[in-house]
Amino acid sequence: MSAQNTTSRPGGRLPAHALPERLSYEQAREFARSEDPAVRAALARHPDTQPEVLYFLAEDSEPEVRRAVARNDQTPRQADLLLTKDGEDGIRTDLAAKIARLTPDLQEDQRSTVYRLTVQALEVLAEDQLVNVRRILADTLKDVAHAPARVIRMLAHDSDLTVAEPVLQFSPVLTDDDLLSIIRSGPIQGALAAISRRDGVVGDLSEAIVQSGDELAIAALLDNRSAQIREETLDIILDKAPGVESWHEPLVMRPRLSAKAGRRIASFVAMHLLDKLQQRI
């Protein structure tokens, strides 16, 4: 079967975008040589198209064809890696969405060629100049327990908060040491607040956040009922709290306040908050 015969329209024959349900290798090669980009794009979308044909189509001159390759779950990782450098922003965006979506189902085997190439592709995309590409990775991988650690750390250090924030707040891949390193590095505005909102912030992280002096991050920390704040760390907060009104209500609502802390809070909060405090201690 030739591409020319299959794609001719007169006499009720298949339109250019329609291909047989099952494709032989010879048919796929013939369609790949078609002068009609709609045929090549249909081939790039086809679930039966062989990996080597998809790799060939990944270098097609038509963006429509390359985008179809980027979106195809059957595309070999070698072709995906090639497309990470594509000049079309939309193609890299679609590629990022696909690879990030497939990553949770990937077997974490460092010896696997597929795993290694997937990590390489993710690392390239995590440094993409287009914020939306990096944001797609962060949003999709933020709660994936087995996401590649280096990729997650790259996203966590991103210079754009919309990329870094979801990973900093939710990723189980980041260790306490990773988070301490980020806190001490003087990250972008909003990064510490994202860490403060994590579930189960440990005492050392809370102390580092408080030592940073970031008022928004400290407010978020106080508002996080699952965050561990040691008494000595709370004392540092209380030393500055009279002049920071945004801390007052979350301080009043902190779980397990000591009598000493309660007395200090009572000395500076407004009357309506004092009533709440008295009901709690």
Report each predicted region and the residues it spans.
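Alpha-helical scaffold segments
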Residues: 1-281
